[in-house]
Amino acid sequence: MITFFEKLSTFCHNLTPTECKVSVISFFLLAFLLMAHIWLSWFSNNQHCLRTMRHLEKLKIPYEFQYGWLGVKITIKSNVPNDEVTKKVSPIIKGEIEGKEEKKEGKGEIEGKEEKKEGKGEIEGKEEKKEVENGPRK
């Protein structure tokens, strides 16, 4: 009985069945890698757009987004002059603000900070040091 790869080998310019198997497997492997690359680039683009939208919401800049084949498209809608919006938005798009939190206005003191207690600085419940004789090691 003629196998699939034997039939395909005549179609593949008279390759041997083994060579045909290798070429078919490598073709499917390359197709899988290409699809994985496309999916990962689409996913990372969407993650970057979502991060950008969160920053735009913090800055209270109006925007709209659209889903497309290549990811998410963000359009900024603002009555503010372009220069001011560009100054705020360009570091977000470049990824420079990623992971940084906004500073709150104030003296910079931490709320709920306890006052320093006066004392010797010793910890309660601390055990006393025990002296150990240094003898020869066995």
From Swiss-Prot:
Sequence repeats lie at residues 94-106, 107-119, 120-132. The keyword Signal does not apply. It comes from the Eukaryota. The keyword Chloroplast does not apply. GO terms for cellular component: mitochondrial membrane. The chain crosses the membrane at residues 19-40. Residues 98-138 are annotated as: Disordered. It is found in: Mitochondrion membrane. It is a single-pass membrane protein. Keywords: Membrane, Mitochondrion, Repeat, Transmembrane, Transmembrane helix. Coiled coil: none annotated. InterPro entries: DUF809. Residues 94-132 are annotated as: 3 X 13 AA tandem repeats of K-G-E-I-E-G-K-E-E-K-K-E-[GV]. Expressed in roots, leaves and flowers. Involved in cytoplasmic male sterility (CMS) by leading to pollen abortion. Not expressed in fertile (normal) plants. Nuclear restoration is accompanied by a dramatic reduction in the amount of this protein in mitochondria of flowers and leaves, but not roots of fertility-restored plants. The restorer genes are affecting either the translation or the stability of the protein. This is Uncharacterized mitochondrial protein ORF138. It comes from Raphanus sativus. The lineage of its organism: Eukaryota, Viridiplantae, Streptophyta, Embryophyta, Tracheophyta.
